From Swiss-Prot:
NCBIfam families: PRK00230.1, pyrF. This is Orotidine 5'-phosphate decarboxylase. InterPro entries: Aldolase_TIM, OMPdecase, OMPdecase_AS, OMPdecase_bac, OMPdeCOase_dom, RibuloseP-bd_barrel. Its EC number is 4.1.1.23. The gene is pyrF. It comes from Dictyoglomus turgidum (strain DSM 6724 / Z-1310). It comes from the Bacteria. Substrate binds at residues 12, 34, 61-70, 125, 187, 196, 216-217.
Amino acid sequence: MRKYYPIIVALDFPEEKRALEIAEKLVPYIKNFKVGLELFSVAGPHIVKALKEMGTNVFIDLKLFDIPNTVVRTLDRLLALEPFMVTLHILGGEEMLRESVKLVSQYKESNKTEYPYLLGVTVLTSFNEETLRRSWGISRSLPEQVLFLAQLAQETGLDGVIASPWEIELLRNNLKRPMLIVTPGIRLTKEKTDDQQRIMTPREALERGSDYLVIGRPITQSPDPYEVIQNIRSQIEDIVESRL
């Protein structure tokens, strides 16, 4: 059983060496790390294995989105890496979701484990309502679209969803059953400084009901990542203790 701690450090780097250097510095304090599309495309399964050798929990965030057969076969290969979490796009549709859930459920049963958590991506945190309409042609408001997709994720059996901090309360108040909510778009201040549109501080996101916080650049691009981690821990420690 993994001890719960809500911070996941996103290793969003274009090279394996830099990612592992950061992980080595932080692993005494943080055990959860995210490997996204950029890093995985460079380092492949080796980066996941290297991180796991450090004793970490690895979130493989590839946001799978393809025909059901392709997604299931890809998931099957990712499961061999024993990830902590895996993502796919809810927009991939009901059949893709159900087939993915079936495979992951069989894996969990066979291996007597509750991991990986299978998570569905709702609406990317770089999107706003104008982007939603112009890029996807969807007339729902952004919160309505997030809720619609989260409900589909729940109906098809996913463990949780990826959603911005702005939609946490909406999901907590409207989903029929509790689901994991994993939250990107976490920044140490409310000031917008990059491509993330819907952001929030770590404490605010946890107070609203997020289970896990994905934090990348504020930690990994800091001159002193350890200091940033300690600052975040001091802000949220009482909330974490109440959940243990």
